[in-house]
Design a protein with these regions (language model features):
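Entry/capping segment at the start of metal-dependent catalytic domains
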Residues: 7-112
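Metal-dependent phosphoesterase core characteristic of DEDDh/y 3'-5' exonuclease domains
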Residues: 4-5, 75, 79-81, 88, ...
Length: 306
């Protein structure tokens, strides 16, 4: 599966992408819908309208706390020699994550919707396009408050965290009405859900304690929240699903793994979605995956056999 991003002013000679007819999509393409300040509300309204049919929402937060796929879920704060993040208690791991999430800006937010079978919504890139393509979203965000910048998202400037927070609630994408109906997914949830919570609060610092953080997630998203990394570590004995997101996608045969890099938030949310759906179908088809709802890697104790 390959992915294509929407055209940007840099590649269209300054002509807004909405004035151009995109190339005819191939059946295996996934179209990355770039979202900016200009089209933030209508795109999130589209997402809200699709939730009854596509109730699985995977988010991927691309932030400035460090590069690399695995680094996106691990702490950036320097630790004493010989001390590993994995060996720290949950309270300490949360404290390190809070330092990073509070200090670093959220650059992009990838959003992928799918149904219970992993199928993506098909949308036209522009109203007059001849064919629809499977689509995911990538929200371009200002790196900090008060700064001004332009991005390729729909030909307009990047959105602010406050604008994103308002749009998520105003459109009903995040609403008590969706509790129990929408399943939220992230890979390495301590960081990606932490940055998503930062977005939902318009850039406010994370709660002071692990318990308050988990309560805030439940308050905004409800009880159906899954961390792909936590779930991947809880598959039956003899199965090892550890490593970066790109590695897991390739190992499990996720179509997103075939896309050429560099991946951005949109592609990574797609990969995380496909990895989660494959783990769910392969290892939790009989017992169900709901036992792991609300559990975040690093914040919850592993089962006895881990």
């Amino acid at each position: 599966m390959s992915s294509r991003r929407a055209p940007t002013p840099a590649t269209t000679g300054g002509v807004p992408p909405s004035a151009l007819r995109p190339p005819r999509p191939r059946g295996s393409d996934v179209f990355i819908r770039l979202v900016c300040a200009e089209n933030l509300m209508p795109e999130l309204a589209t997402i809200r309208a699709l939730l009854p049919q596509y109730p699985y929402v995977t988010v991927y937060a691309e932030h400035a706390a460090g590069g690399g796929d695995y680094a996106d879920a691990d702490g950036r704060v320097a630790l004493p020699p010989g001390v590993r993040v994995e060996g720290l208690p949950a309270a300490a791991r949360y404290a390190l994550a809070k330092i990073d999430v509070d200090a670093f800006p959220l650059l992009r937010l990838g959003i992928t919707l799918c149904d219970a079978h992993g199928r993506l919504p098909s949308l036209r890139a522009v109203p007059w396009a001849a064919a629809a393509a499977a689509s995911v979203w990538q929200v371009e965000l200002l790196p900090s408050r008060g700064s001004s910048s332009s991005s390729g998202g729909g030909g307009g400037g990047a959105a602010t965290l406050r604008a994103l927070a308002y749009a998520l609630r105003a459109t009903g994408v995040v609403s008590p009405e969706t509790w129990g109906k929408v399943t939220w997914v992230a890979h390495g949830g301590l960081y990606h859900l932490g940055f998503f919570l930062k977005a939902l609060t318009g850039g406010a610092p994370l709660p002071d304690t692990r318990g308050e953080f988990l309560a805030a997630l439940r308050g905004y998203l409800g009880g159906r929240v899954f961390d792909v990394r936590y779930v991947a570590a809880r598959v039956p004995r003899g199965v090892t699903l550890k490593g970066p997101l790109a590695y897991l996608a390739a190992l499990l045969g996720a179509p997103a793994a075939a896309a050429r890099g560099p991946w951005q938030a949109g592609e990574k949310s797609l990969a995380a979605c496909q990895v989660f759906m494959r783990i769910k179908g392969l290892y939790f088809a009989w017992d169900g995956i709901n036992m792991h709802a609300g559990c975040i890697d690093g914040l919850h104790a592993p089962p006895p056999w881990s």
